[in-house]
């Protein structure tokens, strides 16, 4: 591996400095390249090429090379006019050329001899082809698509699922319910790099997306699924490149109101209809308010744009209520409101003809109430949690043009994130009755704080046939956390209601319920705090896009990345002495993360309409800081727990004097060693996860504005993190034995995918994009970095963990379009069809509750498609085993897994009042045919099905002992605050635009 890296690195540098253009677009920008020829198809060198931003009037110019080739880098995404001038030829003007973020379209222009006509105007569709300069696999969501397609919850990233190679990912952070996670090229979604205006927007604590933005403030975004340039790092899967809107020379803006409620929505298929008939439909309403305004501060000099969005959602969660009269737990609804405020403001300033500056400030304030972490079938209203999330980000961008071939971009960025989950009810112990979880939740209070400072600088230099880029990046992350666990104490009871009087009080009440045991933090008045989980990130890169011939480009680059403290190097001396014998060698930061990247793009007919491309690259993921938090929280001291004995009864079934009761619970005897939660250590040799990416594909404009693309992608990941048990020690803090878990980078993953896209650019009143993905992937864990849920079955045979990831969709098809109809109507549909995701098959609780060791991880919907197929295995498994060790059979007719399908659409009507003012009425339907789509939320059970072989009866003599009628029953439907596929829902809206 190291030899291969060395050879590739040497090749890259040899190519890069052989001759000192095509162009890779930078983060948050676009590029443009092409050739200029005469009517005899001969190259025209030294022609003057000027591009003009039609919204702001800004211009850039260059001259063609000796081969007649021109290149522009670092252009703001916008609609441009291209003007080509050369003595002896008529001036050629190409109008309305749209440059999207991350794209480098090829625009080849033929000059005509000067005659009676001084200027020849060319339609953009006649000359704008496909990207013949880069080898990346990517797609764009443009401003028109963003504004027209129906979005449940109005999160713009929802549209990333329309592009091939991308699919929904599990939500890793239940405290951020208003974010979406994206799985690209088989990865699980913690990684990926999301940049907004070139600034990092990643959650470095748990992974995934950080801040959300008003949809009306987003201009467009690109998602590069594979093989992006050396400028972009910190991602082993995809890079999402988002651009916010900027002002123009004309004032423009609008406002809107979106509304839906329970009467406009169908009921979830998993909701008990008896409950609905008893207490009514679950109440729900959502109002969203939007506003935007932008325009010139000084025409052709300075501009501004701002956008605001507020969501007020009043929903409910199912809760349990202990009915003392009926002596049973009944189900009811408890309020679960969500309030989310989004704002972004931007100013652009052309200070001189060579200097352009941009400033952006964005804010998000989100509060929500939801159910807490449950270990019982249902929780009470007191067991909910209240999350507060605050986000602030500021970006400064300065672009200086030294000459037509040399420019520099500098970015400064600061963002602050604070999540708090305070105590929901004061002075309440959590009580886990057999059927319901009551009192203050065992996992709160919590707090996470992340502050980031980021500096990026990129120098772009076009010389000869080379488009060179050099750059560096620095990020400083300061993080701290408070994580309470059983701080208020959790009491486990044996009964939901007292069955008799057991104390001296003649009244039968809760104080007569026996206690099984009690868990409480050793230091309940001091929630564990982890300060100074900080990290410095450095990156340097060189990129050379070398146009070897006018129709053949080599993309050559190398990137170096270095994190100082993702392995807790700074706090290594604080590790508990009892586990130091398990640490091998010395701990140092991973310093050899070189990422060579090489690719090609060939336009065989040199007409800008065809691209045959491919390449190879190494891409390093970022290690989330929760890995370091695990070592510091689960260190054997920070989260010490005590387990106390429960109630003691005399021969008559009464409490003995002084025994623990709900009136005085914390008087039982501490059980030595029972409070062990495990000690996590980071392996001294842990490295940064990385993926080797290969791709080969083509793109062809088959007819004007119709583009077909197909790419094969192979990705092989190494050094991904897993937690492996390596022994145990005596822990004096708990006075007992504690297990030791080694956090190590010792597992791999694989992905093979065919990505097909057919799209039509907007013309003749319609556009569409159609995508299909055929993919297969494997990994070693349902989480690629945080080994916090379920460890490997055999710590010495990790290959037994190889299986499909929990969100793998073998087939995924999407269609979306916008169609302008007569009389001001617009129709915009989205259709999604995806195959079933796999899930684990868990042993009955009496046999341990882990997955069945003899089958692969996530075997349901892969190895076994039906209940009959699973039963054939179970019958074979049970042969020769005693009844107590046999597995129960499931229903033969059961289909394992659920195909996902949903059809959403928007129908709108615009009423124009003059040339600049309009009112738009909107109706939206999500999941028109009300198809039941079963999907979960997190990676513990993403399928949404009950996946444990729970016996119908616990008595081995009862036939129900060998039946599991509940296995495979739906637990949760898709959809929620964001996304599609949930119960059918109607939404109405009205917008004002000017």
Tell me what each language-model feature is.
Residues 90-246, 265, 272-278, 282, ...:
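Periplasmic N-terminal accessory/gating domains of Gram-negative outer-membrane beta-barrel systems
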């Amino acid at each position: 591996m190291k030899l291969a890296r060395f050879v590739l690195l040497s090749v890259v540098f040899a190519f890069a400095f052989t001759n000192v253009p095509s162009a890779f677009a930078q983060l948050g920008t676009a590029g443009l390249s092409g050739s200029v020829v005469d009517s005899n198809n001969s190259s025209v060198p030294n022609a003057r090429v000027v591009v003009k931003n039609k919204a702001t009037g800004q211009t850039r110019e260059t001259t063609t090379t000796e081969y007649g080739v021109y290149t522009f880098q670092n252009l703001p995404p916008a609609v441009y006019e291209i003007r080509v001038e050369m003595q002896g030829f008529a001036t050629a003007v190409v109008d309305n050329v749209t440059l999207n973020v991350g794209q480098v379209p090829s625009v080849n222009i033929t000059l005509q001899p000067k005659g009676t006509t001084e200027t020849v105007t060319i339609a953009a569709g006649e000359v704008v082809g496909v990207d013949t300069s880069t080898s990346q696999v990517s797609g764009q969501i443009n401003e028109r698509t963003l504004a027209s397609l129906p979005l449940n919850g109005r999160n713009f990233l929802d549209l990333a699922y329309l592009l091939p190679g991308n699919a929904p990912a599990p939500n890793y952070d239940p405290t951020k319910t208003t974010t979406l996670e994206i799985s690209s090229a088989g990865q699980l979604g913690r990684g990926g790099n999301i940049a907004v205006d070139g600034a990092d927007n990643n959650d470095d604590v748990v992974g995934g997306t950080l801040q959300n933005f008003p949809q009306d403030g987003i201009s467009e975004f690109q998602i590069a699924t594979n093989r992006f340039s050396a400028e972009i790092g910190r991602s082993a899967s995809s890079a999402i490149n988002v651009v916010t809107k900027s002002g123009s020379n004309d004032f423009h803006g609008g406002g809107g109101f979106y509304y839906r409620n329970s009467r406009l929505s169908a009921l979830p298929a998993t909701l008990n209809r008896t409950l609905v008939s008893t207490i009514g439909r679950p109440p729900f309403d959502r109002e969203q308010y939007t506003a935007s305004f932008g325009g010139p501060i000084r025409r052709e000099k300075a501009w501004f744009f701002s956008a605001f969005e507020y969501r007020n959602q009043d929903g409910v969660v199912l809760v349990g209520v202990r009915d003392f009269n009926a002596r049973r737990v009944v189900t009811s609804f408890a309020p679960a409101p969500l309030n989310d405020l989004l704002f972004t403001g931007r100013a652009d300033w052309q200070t001189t003809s060579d200097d352009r500056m941009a400033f952006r400030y964005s804010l998000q304030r989100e509060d929500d109430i939801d159910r807490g972490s449950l270990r019982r079938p249902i929780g009470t209203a007191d067991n909910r949690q209240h999350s507060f999330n605050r986000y602030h980000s500021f970006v400064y961008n300065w672009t200086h043009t030294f000459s037509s071939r040399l420019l520099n971009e500098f970015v400064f960025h600061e963002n602050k994130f604070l999540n708090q989950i305070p105590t929901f009810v004061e002075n309440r112990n959590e009580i886990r009755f057999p059927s319901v979880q009551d009192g203050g939740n065992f996992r709160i209070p919590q707090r996470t704080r992340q502050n980031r400072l980021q500096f990026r600088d990129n120098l772009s230099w076009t010389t000869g046939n080379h488009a060179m880029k050099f750059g560096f990046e620095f990020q400083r992350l300061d993080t701290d956390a408070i994580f309470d666990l059983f701080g208020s104490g959790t009491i486990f009871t044996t009964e939901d209601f007292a069955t008799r009087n057991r104390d001296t009080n003649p009244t039968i009440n809760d104080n007569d319920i026996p206690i099984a045991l009690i868990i409480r933090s050793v230091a309940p008045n001091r929630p564990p705090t982890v300060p100074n989980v900080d990290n410095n990130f450095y990156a340097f890169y060189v990129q050379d896009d070398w146009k070897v011939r006018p129709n053949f480009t080599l993309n050559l680059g190398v990137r170096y990345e270095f994190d100082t403290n993702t392995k807790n190097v700074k706090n290594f001396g604080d590790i508990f002495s009892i586990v130091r014998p398990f640490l091998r060698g010395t701990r140092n930061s991973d310093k050899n993360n070189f990422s060579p990247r090489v690719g090609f793009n060939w336009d065989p007919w040199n007409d800008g309409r065809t691209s045959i491309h491919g390449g190879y690259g190494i891409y390093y993921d970022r290690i989330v800081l929760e890995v370091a938090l695990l070592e510091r929280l689960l260190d054997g001291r920070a989260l010490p727990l005590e387990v106390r004995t429960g109630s003691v009864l005399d021969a008559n079934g009464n409490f003995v004097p002084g025994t623990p009761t709900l009136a005085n619970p914390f008087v039982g005897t501490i059980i030595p060693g029972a409070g062990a939660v495990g000690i996590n250590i980071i392996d001294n040799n842990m490295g940064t996860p990385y993926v080797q990416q290969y791709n080969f594909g083509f793109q062809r404009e088959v007819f004007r504005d119709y583009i077909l693309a197909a790419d094969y992608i192979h990705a092989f990941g190494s050094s991904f993190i897993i937690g492996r048990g390596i022994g145990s020690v005596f822990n004096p803090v708990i006075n007992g034995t504690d297990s030791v878990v080694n956090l190590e980078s010792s597992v791999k993953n694989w992905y093979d995918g065919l990505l097909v896209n057919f799209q039509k650019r907007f013309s003749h009143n319609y556009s569409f994009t159609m995508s299909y993905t055929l993919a297969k992937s494997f990994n070693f864990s349902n989480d690629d970095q945080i080994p916090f849920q379920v460890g490997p079955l055999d710590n010495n045979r990790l290959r037994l963990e190889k299986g499909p990831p929990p969100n793998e969709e073998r087939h995924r098809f999407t269609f979306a379009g916008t169609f302008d109809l007569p009389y001001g109507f617009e129709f915009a549909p989205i259709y999604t069809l995806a195959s079933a995701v796999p899930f684990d098959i868990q042993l009955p609780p009496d046999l341990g509750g882990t997955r069945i060791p003899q089958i692969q991880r996530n075997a349901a919907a892969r190895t076994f498609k039906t209940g009959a197929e699973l039963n054939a295995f179970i019958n074979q498994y049970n042969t020769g085993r005693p009844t107590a060790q046999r597995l129960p059979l499931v229903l033969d007719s059961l289909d394992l897994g659920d195909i996902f399908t949903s059809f959403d659409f928007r129908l709108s009507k615009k009423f124009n009042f003059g040339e600049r003012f309009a009112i738009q009425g909107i109706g939206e339907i999500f999941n028109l045919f009300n198809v039941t789509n079963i999907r979960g939320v997190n990676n513990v059970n993403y399928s949404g099905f009950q996946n444990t072989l729970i016996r119908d009866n616990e008595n081995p003599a009862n036939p129900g002992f060998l039946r599991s009628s509940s296995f495979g029953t739906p637990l949760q439907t898709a959809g929620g605050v964001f996304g599609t596929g949930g119960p059918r829902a109607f939404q109405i809206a009205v917008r004002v635009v000017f």
